[in-house]
Amino acid sequence: LSKVETLFEAAPYSHGLFHYGGGVIFGPDGKLYIATGERNFYEHLNPKLPFAQDVSDRRGKIFRLNPDGSIPDDNPNFGSDAVSGLYSLGIRAAQGMTIDTRTGKIWFSEHGTIQGDELNILEAGANYGWPNRTTGGYRTKNYKPAEVEGALYKDPIHFWENTVAPTGLVFYSGTEFPEWRNSFIVPGLSKGSLWRVATENDQVISSEELF
């Protein structure tokens, strides 16, 4: 490689081993979308205002950039304290991102803690809730995050009742496997599993574990 240029840094540096980065994808609009993890394995390591809910912190967010690293003029406005490029927040660990080629919408998969793994549709300005809203449990006993004034949380399109640990995400639009056409393929870390999730009109109509 030559003329390498840094467009984005997932600052600040931390010693955590979990959920440092996340999915990266170019959207149909030509913009670059980058997910960052919250990095906490135990929720009590959050400050009073959890990292993923703090618009001045890069952790637990999704960012939207122009290909040259500049900030699009039509990005949502989170206020003067917000980190640059912020597009959505309330993310724990969004490792998979893909495009539904039928609609052009970006979907992302997200790790829960104790269960609570999710599929979401990315929307400008949306707050996906972590850690204040989750379909799973917490690893920290008796943990209760501080309320975030005025926050409106977006529910997931789909969540698994048992742990899947979704990593990666692909929308299959090919013809070689017609029964899989227009489905999301989700690999799971917890058991080395593979799931097929079929949707219509942005709603899940079936979910099956392939192996």
Regions found by a protein language model. Name each.
Residues Y20-R39, G60-K61:
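Aromatic- and glycine-enriched pocket-lining scaffold segments that form the walls
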Residues T6-E9, F78-G79, L210-F211:
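Multi-bladed beta-propeller domains
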Residues V4, D29-L32, R102-G104:
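Loop/turn elements at helix/coil->beta-strand transitions in domains of secreted/extracellular proteins
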Residues L1-I25:
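Asp-box/WD-like beta-propeller blade repeats and closely related beta-sheet repeat scaffolds
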Residues E38-E208:
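Beta-propeller domain segments
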Residues F8-A11, P28, I91, T101:
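Short, flexible loop/turn elements at secondary-structure junctions
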